[in-house]
Design a protein with these regions (language model features):
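A generic "folded-domain core" signal
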Residues: 17-166
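Bacterial N-terminal signal peptides
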Residues: 4-12
Length: 166
């Protein structure tokens, strides 16, 4: 039953058939065709009609993304507000648009993944338009395996594609 919260993430995924690669702890790894994801939902379950906060790492079979961190926040941050991902005690400033925040560059992505491997939890913090604090918390149990599964699947897809083209 520990995988049930992670499985709920699959059910909320778009109907574009995602193949489950791994489900463990609070995380899943999904193959969505050209994109693979390691993802989780926040600890707080959204009320009906509200946005369910979720976060994860995206990998592309074409190599464009190698573990880009992304987060869909529970509320829209105030315009110009800083969004901080804190993994364990290590902070990372994220780029944002609307409900979404993501890593700024490949070096930051490597640092975030390394921090995830050593921590038990992370949170995404900001302020909304009325100045209220937004805190979306995540457990990292299962995250390293989900990240590895997503990365490996997209790497193998990229390798298979390059072999077909030669």
């Amino acid at each position: 039953m520990r995988w049930l919260p992670a499985f709920a993430l699959i059910l909320s995924a778009p109907a574009a058939a995602a193949q489950l690669l791994f489900a463990g702890g609070q995380w899943v790894a999904l193959d969505r065709g050209g994109t693979c994801e390691a993802a989780s939902r926040s600890l707080r379950i959204a009320q009906k009609g509200k946005v369910q906060a979720r976060a994860g790492f995206a990998f592309d079979a074409n190599g464009a993304r190698h573990g880009q961190f992304f987060a869909e926040m529970s509320r829209v941050p105030r315009a110009g507000s800083t969004v901080i991902l804190t993994v364990g005690t290590q902070p990372f400033m994220l780029a944002t648009t609307g409900h979404w925040a993501w890593s700024r560059d490949p070096q930051q992505e490597v640092a975030i993944i390394a921090a995830v491997r050593a921590a038990s939890g992370m949170r995404v913090d900001s302020r909304d338009a009325s100045g209220r604090r937004i805190i979306d918390r995540y457990l990292l149990d299962g995250a390293p395996t989900a990240i590895d599964a997503a990365a490996a699947r997209c790497a193998s897809a990229k390798l298979a594609k390059s072999r077909r083209n030669t």
